[in-house]
């Protein structure tokens, strides 16, 4: 629609002289479709109009042969031919009745010649057949060559959805026919007359900025299935409605498919068509209706549900005028000392009785809420006497309870769940082990941690099997990489020995010692080294079975006497994820493990439940399961955590030399009990640094035999608060049966293993 208008011709000339026109009543006109050729689209390019029937040769057979020829016409001309009324009639349409109508490029509706006026340039459209047309009014944007001051420019376009070219098309050739209304009320001659007046450079003002597009319904034009009867009389059964469809240029992009029904009535020759529908866009007035804001009342959470009257209640009674006697600071039934009252509590204590008396229907909670609201309404000057009174109460409380520190009651607050289950109970040492879902999946430790039980003066190594870990008693004799400790999260981990034929010896050497001053150690004597394939199954039935006896300090540790080999093979500690290489034999592997630390939450302020005993350990990384405390990250013993992990420095000499160890945990220093013997270092001492900061000093003497010395007796009073923790309920029932037997029975068991 953007192409420029051609130079309009002043008068339309027919191809031949017009003969006497036939009456147009009962005549249907055919319009030949004209399309520009696919050659360069110039305004003077010729178009070929082919006259044919929409239903084959049914209609074209009544036309003279001269009609069915190609006419060279201009792109803006359309050939109109009258349709023969019947096949048997003699009066056929002559080619002289064909008219080429001159029209502007933006006017698309082409009527047949008018019979009333006789002028070939003033066409009319008489509805004679029961047909209805689709009229679509499309807004047309003004091009650069159109002048908006002249008036709204529009056009009439015919054809089913043809907006580019002038086309009245059907399913067959490029022919279409106009149908009228059987009632004779559809009159559009003024539209055509104004359309043909476009030759003088003026466009019809009745067509406001739109394009009338005549469309036939979906089944207006039948294909060749129609027989000769509907083709001869021009009747096509179908209904149509007149639709006004403005485009997006008029009412916005969302109104493009809006269709408004439009009724066309018969108008006199001097009248103009008026669109009865939505007015143009410039006439639309949108009034902004102000939205009345609805006040939303946010109900405060502190407001009581019942209206409490405070008009006649005095809320500024001074503490000196209240007459409330000083109540002593009482303790509850558990001995808990109450906190001193603050300023609000002092004020509420004075005014609560009066407010409750004024509102007998309110409960205690509603009175408390209202007291809080009224307290917030007071100024600082009004609150000052109550702050002074609260300070006096606080000082008096400090005098009565000098060392009192406020501690919230444990039952009123949700604490962190302690999922720590103690493996051993009674006089045995606690091992921190969590539930199987929270165990840190530590991969392939080198050696295992072996902790004995000291229930009786004569006890035996106790191996523990928990849902997460298993602590075996044997240790590796040869330096080949063998994994003896492998925790599992899903099920109980088994002892994984890569080489079952490895000769193993008990990790706990058979030694006895009477006390801290006893230095005489029994030598190991046995027939030979026994091969131990799995640990001795020992279990503990319950925590109540073994009582907390104070005989640990006088306990005597004894095991079966087995002669160890003359040379020991030791493996230097390596990173936990690295394989263990073959290491050179170290003659004197006097290695010990620092005492396992209890749960960090129970380091201070917890009465000891179990007595301290002497642990034994093997070299290599150690396992510290995770816990809920923030400073005990899994594994607990790894990483450089200042003041959160124990730093044990042990100096272990020969059996007649002094044993000394320095322990530091959570910035508290503890030391082992000093001995009277003087500490001396051997010149062939070897040291290896572990990842968790534990240093081992392996020294040896010039003697041929080596002994694995026990940890000396420690200061129980200084260490029992650190290494002990209350036994929590384990995740599963753990039973360790401790069987007392003499040395012969134990030797027999070890020989069987």
Swiss-Prot record:
Keywords: Activator, Cytoplasm, DNA-binding, Nucleus, Repressor, Transcription, Transcription regulation. Its main location: nucleus. It holds the Pfam family HMG_box. Residues 337-405 bind DNA. Residues 531-540, 726-739 have a biased composition (Polar residues). Residues 7-22 have a biased composition (Pro residues). Residues 1-45, 140-161, 514-540, 726-753 are annotated as: Disordered. GO terms for molecular function: DNA-binding transcription activator activity, RNA polymerase II-specific; DNA-binding transcription repressor activity, RNA polymerase II-specific; sequence-specific double-stranded DNA binding. One of its GO terms (biological process) is negative regulation of Wnt signaling pathway. It is found in: Nucleus; Cytoplasm. One of its GO terms (cellular component) is cytoplasm. InterPro entries: HMG_box_dom, HMG_box_dom_sf, SOX30_TF. It comes from the Eukaryota. Interacts with CTNNB1, competitively inhibiting CTNNB1-TCF7L2/TCF4 interaction. Acts both as a transcriptional activator and a repressor. Binds to the DNA sequence 5'-ACAAT-3' and shows a preference for guanine residues surrounding this core motif. Binds to its own promoter and activates its own transcription. Required to activate the expression of postmeiotic genes involved in spermiogenesis. Binds to the promoter region of CTNNB1 and represses its transcription which leads to inhibition of Wnt signaling. Also inhibits Wnt signaling by binding to the CTNNB1 protein, preventing interaction of CTNNB1 with TCF7L2/TCF4. PANTHER family: TRANSCRIPTION FACTOR SOX-30. This is Transcription factor SOX-30.
């Amino acid at each position: 629609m953007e192409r420029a208008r051609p130079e309009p011709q002043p008068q339309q000339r027919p191809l031949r002289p017009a003969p006497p026109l036939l009456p147009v009543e009962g005549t249907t006109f055919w319009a030949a479709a004209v399309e520009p050729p696919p050659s360069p689209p110039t305004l003077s390019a010729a178009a070929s109009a082919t006259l044919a029937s929409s239903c084959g040769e049914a209609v074209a057979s009544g036309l003279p042969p001269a009609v069915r020829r190609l006419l060279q016409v201009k792109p803006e001309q359309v050939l109109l031919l009258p349709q023969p009324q019947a096949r048997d009639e003699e009066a056929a349409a002559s080619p002289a009745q064909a008219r080429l109508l001159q029209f502007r490029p933006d006017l698309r509706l082409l009527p047949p010649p008018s019979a009333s006026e006789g002028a070939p340039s003033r066409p009319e459209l008489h509805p004679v057949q029961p047909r209805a047309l689709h009229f679509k009014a499309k807004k047309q944007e003004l091009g650069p060559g159109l002048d908006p001051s002249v008036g709204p420019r529009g056009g009439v376009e015919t054809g089913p959805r043809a907006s580019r070219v002038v086309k009245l098309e059907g399913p067959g050739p490029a022919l279409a026919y106009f149908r009228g209304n059987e009632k004779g009320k559809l009159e559009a001659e003024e539209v055509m007359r104004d359309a043909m007046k476009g030759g003088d450079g003026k466009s019809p003002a009745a067509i406001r900025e739109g394009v009338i597009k005549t469309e036939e319904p979906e089944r207006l034009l039948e294909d060749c299935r129609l027989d000769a009867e509907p083709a001869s009389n021009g009747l096509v059964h179908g209904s149509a409605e007149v639709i006004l469809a403005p485009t997006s240029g008029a009412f916005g992009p969302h109104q493009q498919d809006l269709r408004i029904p439009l009724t066309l009535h018969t108008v006199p020759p001097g009248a103009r068509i008026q669109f009865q529908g939505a007015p143009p866009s410039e006439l639309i007035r949108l009034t902004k209706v102000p939205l009345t804001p609805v006040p939303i009342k946010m109900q405060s959470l502190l407001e009581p549900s019942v209206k409490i009257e405070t008009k006649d209640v005095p809320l500024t009674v001074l503490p000196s005028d209240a007459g409330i006697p000083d109540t002593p600071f009482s303790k509850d039934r558990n001995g808990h000392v109450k906190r001193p009252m603050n300023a609000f509590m002092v004020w509420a204590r004075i005014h609560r009785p009066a407010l409750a008396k004024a509102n007998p229907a309110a409960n205690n909670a509603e009175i408390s809420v209202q007291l809080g609201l009224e307290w917030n309404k007071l100024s600082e000057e009004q609150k000052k006497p109550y702050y002074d009174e609260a300070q006096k109460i606080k000082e008096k409380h400090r005098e009565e309870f000098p060392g009192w520190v406020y501690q919230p009651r444990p039952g009123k607050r949700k604490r962190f769940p302690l999922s720590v289950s103690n493996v051993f109970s009674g006089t045995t040492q606690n091992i921190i082990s969590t539930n199987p879902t929270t165990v840190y999946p530590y991969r392939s430790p080198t050696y295992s941690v072996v902790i004995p039980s000291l229930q009786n003066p004569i006890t035996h190594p106790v191996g523990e099997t928990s849902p997460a870990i298993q602590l075996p008693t044997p240790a590796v004799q040869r330096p080949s990489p063998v994994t003896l400790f492998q925790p599992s999260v899903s099920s109980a981990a088994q002892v994984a020995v890569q080489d079952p034929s490895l000769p193993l010896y008990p990790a706990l050497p058979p030694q006895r010692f009477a006390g801290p001053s006893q230095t005489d150690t029994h030598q190991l004597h046995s027939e030979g080294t026994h091969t131990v394939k799995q640990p001795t199954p020992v279990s503990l039935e319950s925590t109540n079975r073994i009582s907390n006896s104070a005989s640990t300090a006088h306990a005597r540790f004894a095991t079966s006497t087995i002669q160890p080999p003359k040379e020991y093979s030791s493996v230097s500690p390596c990173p936990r994820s690295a394989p263990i290489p073959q290491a050179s034999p170290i003659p004197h592997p006097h290695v010990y493990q620092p005492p396992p630390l209890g749960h960090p939450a129970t380091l201070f302020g917890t009465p000891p439940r179990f007595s301290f005993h002497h642990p034994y350990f093997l070299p290599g990384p150690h396992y510290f399961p995770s816990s809920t405390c923030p400073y005990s990250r899994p594994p607990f013993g790894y990483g450089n955590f200042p003041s959160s992990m124990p730093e044990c420095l042990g100096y272990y000499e020969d059996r007649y030399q002094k044993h000394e160890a320095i322990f530091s945990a959570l910035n508290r220093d503890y030391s082992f009990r000093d001995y009277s013997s003087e500490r001396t270092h051997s010149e062939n001492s070897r040291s290896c640094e572990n990842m968790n900061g534990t240093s081992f000093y392996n020294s040896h003497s010039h003697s041929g035999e080596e002994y694995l010395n026990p940890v000396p007796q420690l200061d129980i009073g200084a260490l029992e608060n650190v290494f002990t923790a209350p036994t929590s309920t384990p995740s599963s029932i753990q039973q360790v049966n401790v069987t007392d037997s003499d040395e012969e029975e134990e030797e027999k068991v070890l020989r069987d293993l």
